[in-house]
Amino acid sequence: YPSHYFCPIMIKAHIRKAQKSDAASILFLIRELAIFEKEPRAVIVTQAQIEKDGFGDRPLFACFVAVVDNQVVGMALYYPRYSTWKGPTFHLEDLIVTEPMRGKGIGTQLYNVFLEHAYNTGVKRVEWAVLDWNLPAIKFYQKSGATISEDWRSVQMDKKSIDRYILNINS
């Protein structure tokens, strides 16, 4: 699909692979997303951790950033996963555009570059989560051909729960 099919590109961003020097901007975007998702206190990751985990010897994630006027204004952060049914996949952890730049086609540009990368890499699936109240995002994803699964539930265990579980099985 042409990119204007989803959101008109009013501002052309430069989309590139993130670099270690982008870590502060990445953290800023993560914090902004947490506020948007009504979880402002949930972010505990640090800039140093982003630098190590994304740009160290063994990166745990990769990221594309959108740059306008030498400012990082958006990102698509993802990491590889493996499906026992399909093979290699990517998980799109966050697709974020800073609030003043939303609705200008920057998210579409990031989404396009991420999916082109997935296509060129040969992954068998990409997946991500979207909050049920984020209707503009849901519409955007559905228009692009993504399927919103109603029958799978997201399951998580935070650090405290992991610690408690391990204590219980080892006592």
What residue ranges belong to the model's regions?
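Conserved active-site alpha-helix within GNAT-family acetyltransferase domains
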Residues: 108, 112, 132-150
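Conserved GNAT acetyl-CoA-binding A-motif
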Residues: 119-129
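A short beta-loop-alpha structural element at the N-terminal edge
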Residues: 14-26
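Conserved beta-strand in the GNAT
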Residues: 65, 71-79
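A short, internal acetyl-CoA/4′-phosphopantetheine-binding micro-motif in the GNAT/acyltransferase core
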Residues: 95-102
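Conserved GNAT-fold acetyl-CoA-binding loop/helix
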Residues: 27-52
